[in-house]
């Protein structure tokens, strides 16, 4: 959708604009995967990729840990890259994808706001994120690779140079979908269409 120049909501976030030309073009492209190219609607990405029944999957980079744990027999036979993009009229490639995030909150009625703030500053700091990621991976191996949102910490975790560059490049081409009341239903309706 974003690669087609579209968006999900109007600027005020009061209504969907999924009936716009870019949205309809993106939806057609999306449904073509299933109707024209016969992509399975019930694809078990891990199993089908592991067995070679599908040769490419579009998954979050956290899928890396799943493959490390569940498919050691194909270790070294796969890699990941930035999502392919749409060639624009000027020849540039738009590889924008939508992204989601989670956040940390401190409730306004908390009796320990300052302590909570100090904890969040510590927890999201590079050193804590690297220490946590390293500790988890030392226990679980590569299947425990921690998906930190701290980009400085991400650079310090044991990604290969090619893997790290792919992740960082995709980060530069990720656009958060705005939050709107009831917005959690939007993706459900799109997927079930």
Which residue stretches match the model-derived regions?
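A generic secondary-structure signal for well-formed alpha-helical elements
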Residues: 1-8, 34-37, 61, 71, ...
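Glycine-centered hinge/linker elements that transmit conformational signals in sensory
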Residues: 11-42, 83
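A structural signal for well-ordered alpha-helical scaffolds and beta->alpha junctions
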Residues: 20-27, 60, 160, 183, ...
């Amino acid at each position: 959708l974003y690669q087609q120049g579209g968006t999900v909501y109007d600027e005020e976030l009061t209504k969907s604009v999924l009936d716009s030309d870019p949205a309809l073009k993106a939806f057609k492209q999306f449904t073509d995967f299933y109707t024209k190219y016969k992509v399975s609607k019930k694809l078990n990405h891990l199993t089908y990729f592991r067995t070679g029944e599908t040769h490419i999957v579009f998954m979050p980079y956290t899928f890396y840990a799943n493959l490390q744990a569940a498919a050691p027999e194909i270790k070294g036979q796969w890699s990941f890259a930035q999502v392919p993009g749409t060639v624009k009229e000027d020849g540039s490639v738009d590889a924008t994808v939508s992204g989601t995030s989670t956040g940390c909150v401190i409730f306004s009625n908390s009796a320990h706001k300052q302590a909570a703030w100090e904890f969040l500053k510590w927890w999201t700091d590079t050193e804590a994120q690297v220490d946590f990621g390293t500790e988890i991976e030392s226990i679980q191996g590569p299947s425990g690779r921690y998906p930190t949102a701290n980009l400085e910490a991400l650079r310090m975790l044991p990604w290969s140079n090619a893997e790290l560059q792919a992740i960082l490049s995709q980060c530069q081409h990720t656009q958060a979908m705005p939050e709107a009341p009831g917005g959690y239903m939007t993706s459900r309706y799109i997927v079930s269409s």
